[in-house]
Amino acid sequence: MQTKKSSNLAIALIWFTAAISMAEILTGTWFAPLGWQQGLIAIVVGHFIGGSMFFCAGYIGAKTQKSAMQTVQISFGEKGSALFSLLNAMQLMGWTAVMIYMGADVISILNQTPDASVFPFLTLGLGILIILWLLLGFTKLGIFKSISLVTMFLLMLWLSIQVANKPFIAMDVAQNIKFGTAVEIAAVMPLSWLPVVSDHTKNSETPFKTTALSTLTYTATSCWMYALGLGAALVTGKSEISQILSLAGVSVIGVLIVIASTMINTALPAYSTGMSLNNIFPQLKVTPISVITVIVGIILASTLPVTEYEHFLFFIGSVFAPMIAVLIADFFVLKQHDVRKSVDGVGLGVWFVGFVLYRFLMAKGWESDLGLTFPVIIITFILAILVRKITK
């Protein structure tokens, strides 16, 4: 049976859609204490680091025509990769909660007299819409998604013009941020997509071109969203999405556009959670797990301060940075392209060393101007090659 090939444009649009996100704009606001110039440099440097790993993961999938989790099996074994499917499901649940919270926060603009007691009902209402979207088969409703994408793009373009035409003001911030930390936060966003990028590049007829286009599209758009958040925070002096949109004069129509886009983007991590858990437990159906993920997201968004998710981002970095380092060493240097073991103890052992190193350095407060991801990847990469050669 011949596999259907995906066009480069279609794949690029997937990553363009993924990057246009309230979560990325909010994360960009954290860079405001650095100022515009230093904040922008941190955004670009971080995305270059994370985007490079994004490219490597996508290219491996495109060359081998394997899905993301199938490529992970190359380094960690068929059953060993289940660990990363589980960790991926956990991070996707976290993103689902963050997106639901932000969507509800945007809806609150419509309420002229803000009331905290109403917020749980807003998260519930948005969650129900997302569940209906999943049950209707969100992967098939292309026209609605296309309209939402175009209108969201126009709204972000309008917001960018608003930010560019206004002067920066002093921002009241409770905490400062180091340059290295900012680079790390920028690098982690592309890393969070490593467990799914190959799912979209594996059917390409032009592996390098497709992966390069996907990487460029996502990283450039993500940089735009980060920069928009940074600029909006410097212009308004605020760091909450609802306040930024309100001060920018976003109308009811604009709010509805954001809600529609948030609904679509939130369905993606929820559905991917079902796919990840289905890889571990085939008896589990994807759609019911996706619905449960949204329900968990509603609860988390209503009860936890999910917008303070710096540690969540660092968790993603600590898991997926050493993972991709081992995979890059095996595939590009050691030329290991096939699954050889059920559980690859060497690969898992090296990954664990990288994971512990990341957490240890973070706990000690150590960081370079390039963050933690870059040095951890380099060390894990070298260690993987040495240990593989010794244990061969």
Label every PLM stretch briefly.
Residues 81-114, 263-279:
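Hydrophobic transmembrane alpha-helices that form the core helical bundles
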Residues 29-58, 80-82, 218-220, 375, ...:
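Extracellular loop-to-transmembrane helix junctions
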Residues 13-19, 85-89, 111-136, 148-160, ...:
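Transmembrane alpha-helical segments of multi-pass small-molecule transport proteins
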Residues 174, 325-390:
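C-terminal membrane-solvent junction of multi-pass transporters and transport-like membrane proteins
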Residues 121-163, 173-174, 214-218, 314-325, ...:
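Membrane-interface loop-to-helix entry segments
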Residues 1-38, 178-183, 195, 202-209, ...:
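Membrane-interface "cap" regions at the ends of multi-pass membrane proteins
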